[in-house]
Amino acid sequence: MIDEASPMMELKGNKSKVYWDKIDKLASVISQIGEEKTKTSPAIIGVSEIENVSVLEDLVKSVHIKKKNYGIIHYESPDKRVIDVALLYQKRYFKPIFHQSFNPNIYRNNRKVYTRDQLLVSGYLDDELIHLIVNHWPSRSGGEMKSRPLREKAAYQNTKIIEQVREKDPNAKIIVMGDFNDDPINASFKKVLKAKGKKKFIMILLLKANEFIPLINY
């Protein structure tokens, strides 16, 4: 299913063929991530740039990952580009018990910025309670400096979600994931989220993330 606002509507030719080819390639990549060491695909996957839940339903039904029995948690957001975030999870590994969508209250020049929701999902991963926040913060369109306050406000929304979780469990295990359109050295992380970590550890994470770039750069 392709929304009327989708960039795919601008394509000439067989849109359906392009769509199903992309679904097949995405599912193929997902099936390969970590498979060499774990013999399975990821237990949880945060996704962004999702047009509607039908896209996710088509994805998890792909022959590459159908047997993994992925569940879907998705909310429609008010984003002006009609794209959302969502969570995919293997039902045998992760058991969700709560989920909620939050829209950042972001304004620029006294006008509301319609951006993606932030998705909170709580559940048990191998019998251990964890909390996931899936993000897709405002882009750097118009320049990094000009758009920086938007991402800082998105980060602030993350802090409110984290506070909500920690009110019930001060020692809660929280994973913040997604497309932040920012780097660990930016103020959204260092000043707003107050993220801390050893530089060597951060570099290892970045290097490991880069290993997957050839897989998805098709």
Explain the meaning of each model-derived region:
Residues L150-Y218:
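Metal-dependent phosphoesterases centered on the DNase I-like endonuclease/exonuclease/phosphatase
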Residues T40-I44, K67-Y70, D126-I130, D169-I174, ...:
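Loop/turn elements at helix/coil->beta-strand transitions in domains of secreted/extracellular proteins
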Residues A5-S6, E128, L132-S147:
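Active-site His/acidic residue clusters
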Residues I50-L129, W137:
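Structured beta-strand-rich core segments of catalytic domains in phosphoester-bond hydrolases
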Residues S31-E35, V55-I65, Y93, K160-P170, ...:
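Sec-exported extracytoplasmic/periplasmic mature domains
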Residues D24-I30, K112-S122, Y156-E163:
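A Trp-anchored, charged/polar loop motif used as the substrate-binding/catalytic surface
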Residues M1, I50, W137, D179-F180:
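Active-site metal-binding loops of divalent metal-dependent hydrolases
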Residues M1-I65, N69, I73-D79, I83-V85, ...:
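N-terminal, active-site-proximal structural segment of metallo-dependent hydrolase catalytic domains
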